[in-house]
Amino acid sequence: MAGFKILGFNHTSFTVSDLDRTIRFFVEACGFELLTRGPRDAGLLEKMTAIPGADVEIAFVQGPGHRLELIEYKGPADRAVIQSRLCDAGSAHIGLDVDDIEAAVRVAGDYGFRLAGEIITIDNGPNAGRRVAYTRDQDGVTVEYLQAASSGAQ
């Protein structure tokens, strides 16, 4: 044991280029609740992240059983949008259980999320019958939708 105890998950975070757009997706499309939104102390962020000129606005949204932190850096000026592939180390996503995967993908598309591949049905193993799809927005924020084998038409 490491000498400390993990008490639980606090949040998962995505850095985004447009906080308004990303909040709209999670609140309007996914039904999450906007908990807080606002700028953070740049000096503290510089110390915490070791990024000179760190200037951010942060929002927290709450979904069923989990909280997301959405961060938009306004500075430094040389920040970039990184488009990693799903197979690249460091790539991350969240997985959301849904009752209708086609509807979830369609609504996500209305907010700029596009299918990374196809909606598939797992045909063997412990998840046989489960339907799965990855969607990504222009920042590379990746949301996986999962529909249980017993939910809806297949």
Outline where the language-model segments fall:
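Vicinal oxygen chelate
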Residues: 1-5, 14, 37, 60, ...
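Exposed loop/turn and edge beta-strand positions of beta-sandwich/beta-sheet ligand-binding modules
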Residues: 8, 55, 90, 129
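Short, structured motif recognition centered on aromatic/hydrophobic residues
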Residues: 9, 61, 68-71, 91, ...
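Core segments of cupin and vicinal oxygen chelate
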Residues: 15-65, 103, 110, 123-128, ...
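A short, acidic/glycine-rich surface segment
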Residues: 42-47, 77-82, 124, 153-154
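Long, charged/polar, surface-exposed segments that mediate recognition or autoinhibition
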Residues: 82-87, 104-106
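Short secondary-structure subsegments characteristic of cysteine-rich extracellular domains
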Residues: 83, 91-96
